[in-house]
């Protein structure tokens, strides 16, 4: 989270310094800093335990977690010189860690107590996208637009498996946990819409929504007894962003 906040501050600072340079030449090139809330959705969560001949499969459903996001884009506006209401940009966008936790199994015994197995997924999604925008230009200072994007998503996946036991009186008697992490490099695509407000001929504010599909994340690991575990999830994000160009 601290890295994302720091990047957001640098992105906004870079916008104004680069904007001053670009305005003098009216080249059509622009720089945009973006920040906002990302609702990261972990859909169709799956967990598998492989204990030799015994295999157990669990479903965790869908889970949303709202995190902070920020990014920086460098683009070109074709309207400046070609009178075509299209923009194309390269954008990096980072998001904070989104958490999801669900229970795999619970058991009870009147003699020895009981136990519960839980798993947790923590995902961080960074994207590098090529975005194309179509601007619905008009005579006002407000310009609605729609967008599509294609690119690369790097998903950092941390998984925790926890086995908790309690005695017949209900007190926790033992907790064991496995922690593993890994990365997935995926194809990503997005669609979006928004509106831009021209504060001055050289400065614009932007409010937008984007749906991002970042592919699937899969993490496999073993414990000391060579028992196998696998956590899988489909990764999506709903980005609500404020931008300064």
What are these regions (language model features)?
Residues 33-37, 70-76, 130-134, 148-152, ...:
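Residues on the lipid-exposed face of transmembrane beta-strands in outer-membrane beta-barrel proteins
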Residues 81-86, 140-142, 197-205:
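Repeated loop/turn-to-beta-strand initiation elements of outer-membrane beta-barrel proteins
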Residues 40-67, 94-127, 153-186, 214-239:
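Extracellular/periplasm-exposed beta-strand and loop segments of Gram-negative cell-envelope proteins
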Residues 119-124, 135-141:
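Helix-adjacent hinge/juxtasegments
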Residues 1-26:
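Cleavable N-terminal export/targeting peptides
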Residues 30, 234-245:
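Outer-membrane beta-barrel "beta-signal"
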Residues 24-39:
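Transmembrane beta-strand segments of Gram-negative outer membrane beta-barrel proteins
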């Amino acid at each position: 989270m601290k890295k994302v906040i720091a990047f957001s501050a640098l992105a906004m600072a870079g916008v104004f310094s680069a904007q001053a340079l670009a305005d003098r030449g009216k080249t059509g090139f622009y720089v945009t800093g973006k920040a906002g809330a990302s609702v990261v959705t972990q859909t169709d969560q799956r967990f598998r335990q492989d204990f030799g001949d015994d295999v157990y499969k669990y479903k965790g459903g869908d889970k949303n977690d709202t995190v902070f996001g920020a990014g920086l884009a460098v683009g070109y506006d074709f309207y400046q010189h070609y009178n075509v209401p299209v923009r194309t940009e390269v954008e990096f966008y980072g998001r904070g860690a989104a958490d999801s936790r669900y229970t795999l199994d619970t058991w009870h015994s009147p003699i020895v107590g009981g136990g519960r197995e839980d798993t947790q997924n923590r995902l961080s999604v960074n994207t590098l996208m090529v975005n194309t925008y179509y601007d619905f230009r008009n005579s006002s200072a407000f310009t609605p637009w729609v967008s599509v994007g294609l690119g690369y998503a790097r998903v950092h996946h941390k998984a925790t498996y926890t086995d908790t036991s309690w005695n017949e009186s209900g007190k926790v008697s033992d907790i064991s946990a496995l922690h593993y992490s890994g990365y997935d490099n995926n194809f990503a695509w997005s669609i979006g819409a928004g509106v831009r407000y021209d504060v001055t001929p050289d400065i614009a504010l932007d409010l937008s929504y984007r749906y991002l599909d970042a592919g699937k994340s899969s993490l496999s690991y073993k414990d000391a007894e060579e028992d196998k575990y696998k956590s899988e999830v489909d990764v999506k994000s709903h980005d609500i962003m404020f931008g300064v160009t």
